[in-house]
Amino acid sequence: MKAKTVIHVSTECYPAAKAGGMADVVGSLPKYLKDHGWNPVIVTPRYRLPWFDKQNLRRDYAGSFGMEDDTAIFEVYRLKKGDLPFDYYCIDIPGRFDRNSIYLNESGHGYDDEAERNISFQRSVIKWLSDPKSGVTPDLIHCHDHQTGFIPFLIKNTEEGKALASIPSFYTIHNGAYNSRYSWGRIDLLPKFPSKLSQFIEWDGHIDAVATAIRYADHVNTVSPSYLEELKDQLAPLKHMMSRTPDKFSGTLNGIDPDEWNPKTDKLLSNRLTTTVDQYKKVNKAELLSELYHLNNIPLISFIGRFAHQKGADLLVPAVERVLARFGFVNFFILGSGDPFIERKVQELRDKYAERVGCFIGYNEALAHQVYASSDFIVMPSRFEPCGLNQMFAMRYGALAIARMTGGLKDTVIDFESGGLGVAFDYDSVDDLTHAMGRALHLYRDTKRYKQIRKNAMKMDFSWNQSAKQYISIYNQLIEN
C-alpha cells in the first residue's frame, strides 16, 4: 500500500532554521510519522543561514506568479535524500528570505516587508504543489502558524490553488500571541478571489491570517489541550468557530526526541548517566558550578529560556533573592537572553551573590544540556506557555519542574502533593514563585521522597510516538472524508 504524503509547510524546521519551539516540532514530528508508514515532506523558505551553505541542495523546480504590479520568481531546492530522516525542500525567493535572520532585522524588529515575505512563500508553495512536474503529490497539507495561514483559503478559492482544492488542510497554532495582520491595502498581494469572500479573510478591519486559517482549514489544533481552552478567551475567531464547529478543533501535546534527549547517550554531555543518578548529578553540577562554593551537597534550581514577559523572567531576580535570604542552602543557574533590562538584573544578581548564582547570557545548546543534567529543579514561571518542552527535557534528565499552571505546563506538570512529579503554582507573582521554590527545597530535604519522584519523572514517556498517533488519526479522518 502506497504511503500517504503529508506536506508540512513552515517557516522553521530544526536543524535548518530555528527561532523557537515550532522548529523542534517540524523537525521531530515527521520522523515519527515516517515510523508509522507515512511519507512526510517538509518545505521552508531558504534563508542565508550557515546550515544551508553546508548542505547538498539541488534545484528541483522554478516558477513565478504575478504579485501586485510585479512578477515574483522562485526556485525550489531539494536536500539530498538521506541527509535528514524525511524529504526536505526549501524555496528561494530572491530579495525576500536571503537574509541572516529568520524574522528580525539588525535592530531586533520585524522586517518591513513581512507581508510580501509570508504571502510570497505561501503562493510559491501552492504554485509548486499545483504543478504535476513538482513530483510531490500531497494527500494532506499541514500548515504551521500564522506565516502559512492563508494557504487553506487560497487552495479552496483561487484559480492559482484550484488544483489542490480537494486536498484537506490542517492548521497548527504554535503561539497565538503572533499573527500576520495586514491593512486592506495589501489585498493585491493575494491572488484574485471572488470579492464576496473578502469578509472571510477579515477580522477587526484587517486581513488576518490566523482568522482565515481558523475558518478555512479542515482541522485546527494547538500544541496542548489546555492551551486550546485558554486561546478561546484570547482569540475571538477561535471562540466564534469553536462554538459552531467544536469537532474541528483539538489540542495535541508536543513531544521530544528521546534519542536526542537521552542522558545516557547525549553527545553534548561530557558526563553522561553511566552509574547512579546521584553520581551523574554530582559530576555535572561540579563542572557547571566550578566557580561557586558548596557544589555537590545542596540543591540547584535553574532557569533556561528567553528573558521575556511571556516566560515570567521578570519574576526571577526578586524571587531568587528572597529564596536566598530565607533558605541559603541553594544554588541557582540562569541561562538565557532577551530583554536588556532583565539581562542586566541577572548579571547584577550574579555579581551580588557570586557564591550562589551562576549565569550565562545568550544561548548555548551544549550548555543547556549540561544545565538539565546538573539541576535538581528547573523553574518555569511562564505567564502563558502553549506547550513547553523544558519541563519534558528536565524530567528526562532528572530535574523536577517548578511550573506555573498554564497551557501545556498544566497538562504535563502535576504537583507532587497531588501524586504528581513536579511543583505547581498558580499566580504570576514573585510571592507565588518564591513560595513554590521554597516548597521544592522542602521536598529536596525529604531525600527518600525526592529521589522516588525523580526516578518516576525520568521514566516519563514524552516522546513523539503518542502524539504522532493522534495526528495520524486526524489526518486519516480528513483524507477519508
What do the predicted segments below correspond to?
Residues 1-481:
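Catalytic cores of nucleotide-sugar-dependent glycosyltransferases that transfer UDP/GDP/TDP-activated
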